[in-house]
Amino acid sequence: MPIMPDTWIREMATTKGMIEPFTEAQKREGVISYGLSSYGYDARVADEFKIFTNVDNAIVDPKQFDATSFVDRKTDVCIIPANSFALARTVEYFRIPRDVLVICLGKSTYARCGLIVNVTPLEPEWEGHVTLEISNTTPLPAKVYANEGLCQFLFLKGEGTCEVSYADRAGKYMRQRGVTLPRL
């Protein structure tokens, strides 16, 4: 399962709409970098955040998730409380080819500050804004900057085409827009 280079990512983004909007070269000056890299794409976090709060002493249950556990914020700088997390989304909308699986890793700039980004793999033929889970593992509040780089996506091309894609299964997160909470 080879990792795909910048030339392939650029071609797929510009001719097939795999990443929209697509930033051709890495933007770095005065911001946390984003855009095309050698073997990946550094995505930006949008200015929409759902910040976890436990004012009602709730129990987190993925089968019966209570949306009131979050406070919605539209802001250029999100403050994530100590030992808490926030949900966000990418600025970019992704359309994954049928023979590709995409994995996501957090950027080292944030990891070195105790912020961890978690995203499940983007499956073949999935499309949408990527919902990002950002964990603040520190005992202090932490900042996340909207419209700057947060994570890097790596594109792995399969040796063949999968028999059943995410679209074929009519996956529950297909074509998601905005920050999407857990669904059953």
Curated annotation (Swiss-Prot):
Oligomeric and partner information: Homotrimer.
Function: Catalyzes the deamination of dCTP to dUTP.
Organism: Rhodospirillum centenum (strain ATCC 51521 / SW)
Protein name: dCTP deaminase
GO molecular function (one): dCTP deaminase activity
Residues forming the catalytic site: E133
EC number: 3.5.4.13
Enzyme class: hydrolase
SUPFAM superfamilies assigned: dUTPase-like (SSF51283)
PANTHER family: DCTP DEAMINASE (PTHR42680:SF3)
Catalytic activity: dCTP + H2O + H(+) = dUTP + NH4(+)
A GO biological-process term: dUMP biosynthetic process
Positions of dCTP binding: K107, S108, T109, Y110, A111, R112, T131, L132, E133, Q152, Y166, Q176
Pathway, per record: Pyrimidine metabolism; dUMP biosynthesis; dUMP from dCTP (dUTP route): step 1/2
Family: Belongs to the dCTP deaminase family.
Keywords: Hydrolase, Nucleotide metabolism, Nucleotide-binding
Annotated InterPro entries: dCTP_deaminase, dUTPase-like_sf, dUTPase_trimeric
